[in-house]
Structure formats: structure tokens, C-alpha cells
From Swiss-Prot:
Protein name: Thymidylate synthase
TM segment ranges: none
Catalyzed chemical reaction(s): dUMP + (6R)-5,10-methylene-5,6,7,8-tetrahydrofolate = 7,8-dihydrofolate + dTMP
Lineage: Bacteria, Bacillati, Bacillota, Bacilli, Lactobacillales
Organism: Streptococcus pyogenes serotype M1
Family (UniProt): Belongs to the thymidylate synthase family. Bacterial-type ThyA subfamily.
Amino acid sequence: MTKADQIFKANIQKIINEGSLSEQARPKYKDGRTAHSKYITGAFAEYDLAKGEFPITTLRPIPIKSAIKELFWIYQDQSNSLDVLEAKYNVHYWNEWEVDQTRTIGQRYGAVVKKHDIISKILKQLAENPWNRRNVISLWDYEAFEETKGLLPCAFQIMFDVRRVGEDLYLDASLTQRSNDILVAHHINAMQYVALQMMIAKHFGWKIGKFFYFVNNLHIYDNQFDQAQELLKRQPVASQPKLVLNVPDRTNFFDIKPDDFELQNYDPVKPQLHFDLAI
């Protein structure tokens, strides 16, 4: 069993056994019912990517291609436009969060990255001093929240650090997430930010190091407990999936494409499970 599957099953079981029930929940299902959840707080995981530990479960198929395309929309295109997301990447699931028929998600995610020129600043800082301790990407922008409606960012902060091991430099990353639907989005979000870590490492010709993942509120929605039990029953495959970025070292961050990523040794348990999303 992979480390990701061990952590996944342990967290599902912990939520079922020890979780608290939500109150005054904001999300709704499509039929208008309030989407309550059972949750735990302060979930943490550590993966050593250099040793082949990747945060993706084999217990169900994870749509990694669309997840990486979404990441490019945020950090390369630096856009909040649903038209860009659909036309360029053929990704449609963000339509559920369109703001007031604007064909945007409001001043969120990519719009905040562009507003503060975050990627250029991070790359400049790392180029000038790889060992600086100020490499923080934060999407938590109160001014933007007041400017427009929109879903507040779930994965909202990632920090980077560089370590020397022998002759090699390794890039570590720490992702902080305020809220996460473990059955649907947990491994999508984790692998998105592993991909971002890999893109920055490639930009400088560094190796990928460790990935740290902290979720403040990790939950299962009240219409997902049958799926949770099914996942606990499933036996994971033996192979360890691995995400590979097939570009030369020092490829410019903005020249990398979604198709440059390849998920190897991934043969998840099927069939896929159906989830009604909370919006």
C-alpha cells in the first residue's frame, strides 16, 4: 500500500469515528439542501517526492490531467476567466462557481496571482537567493474578497524552501488549505501543487524534495458516506504512481505545457465513484 493510500484510509476512518458535525454550513447541493459535513481539524501529511512518495490515491481514479490544466490557468495564464479555462483547456467544472453571469469566478485565484505579479516575484527571489525564507504564495486577499463575490480560495498558501544535499539542490514545498473535501478534491489539490513545485524546480534545474500538506478542515459531506465505506473496503494496487515533468532542466516556467506532465505507474481501482458536489 502506498503512503498516500495509508494516509487516505486513516483520515477517512478518523473522520467517521472522531469527526465533528458541521453547523451553519454555507455550501448547498443542487437541489437546494444545505450540504452538511463531518470533519476533523489540523490534518497534516508529509511526502518525500525524491523517494517516489506522491500524494495520489490508487483507490479511485483521480482526474490529474484536468487538475494540472486548472493549475496552469491560475499560475501561467493568471486568469479568472471561465472562457479561457474552457477554450484553452476544455475544463468546465468551475462553471458552478460563476459570479453574477460575468463568465468569471470573481477576483480569485489567477486574478490575485496577476494582481500581485506573484510568480515573477517568486522566481526572482529564488534566482537572487535560493536560501531566502520569504518564498510565499498567498491567495488570501481581503481587498479582492470585498471587490467581488466568489468562492474564497481553498488551497490558499504555498511556501518554498531550498536544501542542499551533496552537490544537488532540492526544492521543498508546504501547502496550506483552509478546507478540503477529502473524497473528491484531496489528491487533486495535492497533486496540483506538486506540479507547481516541479515547474519551479525545473525552471532552476533543481530536484524536487519534500511536499508538506496541511488542511485545517478536512471533511466528508453527508451524502458521501456510502462512497467513504466503499473506499475503505477497496484494496489498493501495489504500484507507486509517479508524476514526471518531461522537459529539460532550466526550462522557463512559462514555457512548460500541461502535456509535458506524465503520470506513470497509475492503475487505480475501478469503477469510478459518483459524487454530488456541494457548491
